[in-house]
Regions:
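Conserved beta/loop motifs at nucleotide-recognition and modification sites
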Residues: 1-256
């Protein structure tokens, strides 16, 4: 248990350092991005691109490489491509598992990571592929530890999400109180990509400045966990009609 807490604290410290470095324009050469919160990951990738590459120069200096079929040769050629009318290049590799690469490719990749040019920023994004370091592969793990940062974009704490939901609604000209923001999280889950689309729908639907629970219930699509809780609660209160209605909603959600 203590080890898990220490790992979580270390990951949070790296995340805070990454945000501070980014705000100060101090962007390194190598990053591993992983974690469930894709909204934040994509947000910070956009921030990195904006800070590293002048507007209009993205097509020359921003390189997006799919992990499937990627070779060390292809990556090396992209890394060696000099920036054009930009101080740096940004390379984003999606879903390439460094630690599961064939030995020859892994050795070549390790060499690339160990000697990245100063103008290059290389980001490995683990989206559908889970990130798991393997200390037995000492050279690769050592290169990542020495040259890069492993940044985890974890699910946000409820207090941070409530504040963020409030800011998003204010940007749409609405207000929402803490209890209703918490209800929205309960109903729609705590991942920001899911919440942002529901916030947009609710903001467009709400007639008054203050968003109400009725506004949320009218248009928000609940996650299955919330409906299961609602059904068991209705069963506990012996409200069978409501329980069966909720069961019907669950079947519909599963079909969708």
């Amino acid at each position: 248990m203590a080890t898990k807490r220490n790992d979580k604290s270390a990951a949070q410290a790296v995340y805070r350092k990454f945000k501070k470095d980014l705000s100060q324009g101090t962007i390194g050469s190598l990053y591993i991005f992983h974690g469930e919160e894709a909204y934040l990951r994509d947000y910070y990738l956009d921030q990195m691109k904006a800070k590293l590459i002048p507007g209009g120069m993205e097509s020359f200096n921003y390189h997006l490489l799919p992990g499937k079929g990627l070779t060390a040769q292809r990556l090396g050629e992209t890394v060696d491509a000099l920036p054009m009318m930009s101080p740096r290049t940004l390379i984003v590799v999606n879903d390439y598992d460094l630690f599961k690469a064939p030995e020859g490719e892994r050795t070549a990749m390790t060499k690339i990571l160990s000697d990245l040019p100063e103008y290059c920023c290389l980001v490995f994004v683990y989206d559908t592929v889970p990130y798991k370091s393997d200390a037995r592969m000492r050279k690769l793990a050592g290169a990542i530890q020495e040259k890069g940062q492993v940044v985890q974009f974890a699910r946000q704490q409820q207090g941070d999400l409530v504040d963020w939901i409030g800011r998003r609604f204010r940007a749409l000209g609405h207000e929402i109180d803490t209890a209703d923001a918490q209800y929205l999280i309960f109903l729609c889950g705590d991942l920001m990509n899911g919440l942002i689309s529901e916030i947009g729908k609710i903001g467009a639907f709400a007639k008054n400045r203050r968003v109400t629970r009725q506004d949320i219930d009218a248009v928000a699509i609940p996650v299955i966990d919330a409906k299961v809780f609602e059904m068991t609660d209705a069963l506990g209160r012996r409200q069978m009609d409501q329980a069966f209605a909720t069961l019907g909603d669950l079947f519909q959600l599963r079909q969708e």
